[in-house]
A protein has these predicted regions:
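Basic, Gly/Ser/Thr-rich N-terminal segments that form RNA-phosphate-binding interfaces in CRISPR RAMP
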Residues: 1-276
């Protein structure tokens, strides 16, 4: 079985909601249940690519549409998009792309790379990062927390090599990811992924009066711009990848497209990889 990896780099905030919630956020984003990391559901990936597919091969590649008398499964399996790097505010260097050993290990396994060990992260107040994010030579202020920076150039170079596979981030990503990557402990990464997403207030307007409806204030959670996800695709029947119409570029995924949310740059990783 052959597989490919799709990268999603969010050019605008992304909202793929999980429905109404009883918490403080009315419409939170979908998350991995055990890590709390935001995800892009496989159904969303499949749906947006199906919408871009040529009609002549749509059912063959993606399967029959619901309600059709003769049903057929698709020739490609689409997995959920997993978080790879998440932007966090930094007092120096504007922002960092946060990641952690769990994320790096999972991704490195899929692309056939080895991930280094991060012994300093047993102390959750430490991070691996470039010295350019330091405010006093050895500490960085990320969001509202101060971390001790471990400037291990060997580890950072190996992590940068893993991220060099990503091509969809454009000039911002390619020009600075080596200086902005920050490796946090798994615990701190999960905390930031849960708390550093934006929560935006909205109100429903009454068309007849032009003013807000009573009780119509609501909020939605969004994954910030400059986030990076990856998703695997598996070829269930030989030649299916060759029939895909979309070959990379800009697409919109998730809700609130008319207000500019969900625009992503998308790229496919290298050659087909054999699934072990």
């Amino acid at each position: 079985m052959k597989s490919k990896i799709m990268f999603f780099y969010t050019e605008t905030p992304l909202h793929i909601g999980c429905g109404n919630d009883v918490g403080a956020v009315d419409s939170p984003v979908q998350r991995d249940s055990h890590t709390g990391f935001p995800i892009i559901p496989g159904s969303a990936v499949k749906g947006v690519l199906r919408d871009l597919q040529d009609d002549s091969s749509c059912n063959e590649v993606f399967g029959s549409a619901s309600g059709e008398e003769l049903s057929k499964s698709g020739d490609i399996a689409f997995c959920e998009g997993k978080l790879l790097a998440f932007p966090l505010r930094s007092m120096k260097n504007s922002f960092v792309w946060a990641t952690c050993p769990y994320i790096l290990g999972r991704f490195a396994e899929r692309i056939g790379c080895e991930v280094p060990r991060f012994p300093a992260l047993s102390d959750e107040s430490k991070i691996y990062a470039d010295s350019s994010v330091c405010v006093d030579g050895k500490h960085a202020v990320i969001e509202e927390y101060t971390f001790e920076v471990v400037p291990d150039t060997g580890i950072l170079e190996r992590v940068a090599e893993i991220f060099s596979k990503v091509e969809c981030g454009g000039r911002v990503w390619r020009g600075s990811f080596g200086k902005r990557i920050a490796i946090f402990s798994d615990t701190m990464m999960s905390y930031f992924a849960k708390t550093a997403c934006s929560v935006d207030q909205h109100v429903c307007i009454d068309d007849s009066t032009g003013i807000a409806k009573d009780g119509a204030l609501f909020n939605i959670e969004t994954v910030p711009s400059d986030s990076l996800f990856y998703s695997e695709m598996f070829e269930l029947r030989a030649g299916a990848f060759d029939k895909l119409t979309f070959g990379g570029g800009m697409l919109q995924i998730g809700g609130d497209a008319s207000t500019g949310l969900g625009f992503c740059k998308v790229d496919f990783f290298g050659k087909d990889c054999s699934d072990d």
